[in-house]
């Protein structure tokens, strides 16, 4: 089941500093980011092995997750919010604002055989 984390953020008159350390439950092997999204829905898959951490570092977006038993919706509206997606979490990302940048940290290197595109059936 996906989980929402609050990343530690330090704020002073100079601005904000958000830290990603000792909170992500895996060793990062890959980082990618999604931006310039129109009204399209991204994702639409789950994984065999990969765990992911999704952070909307600019703008906002929504993440829908279904682990085969429970459905969850996360609205990422601030850069200190992080959603951990387990391999079994079939997920889509949508409602991107025009300025949105969604950064994703992954536990595995890209492997097309790690993707499962079939969604779970109705609960």
Q: Model segments located where?
A:
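Non-catalytic, conserved peripheral segments adjacent to functional cores
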Residues: 1-83, 98-107, 111-120
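Short beta-strand-centered segments at strand-helix junctions
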Residues: 85-88
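Asparagine-centered strand-capping/turn motif at beta-strand->loop junctions
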Residues: 94-95
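Surface-exposed, Lys/Arg-rich phosphate-binding patches that contact polyanionic backbones
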Residues: 91
């Amino acid at each position: 089941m996906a989980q929402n984390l609050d990343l530690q953020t330090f704020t002073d008159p100079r601005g904000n500093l958000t830290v990603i350390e000792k909170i992500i439950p895996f060793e990062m092997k890959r980082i990618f980011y999604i931006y310039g999204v129109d009204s399209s829905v991204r994702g639409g898959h789950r994984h065999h092995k990969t765990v992911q951490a999704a952070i909307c570092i600019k703008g906002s977006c929504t993440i829908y997750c279904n682990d085969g038993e429970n459905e969850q919706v996360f609205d990422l509206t601030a850069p200190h919010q992080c959603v951990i997606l387990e391999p079994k979490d079939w997920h889509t990302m949508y409602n991107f604002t025009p300025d949105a940048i969604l950064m994703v940290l992954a536990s595995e290197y890209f492997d097309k055989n790690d993707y499962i595109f079939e969604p779970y059936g109705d609960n």
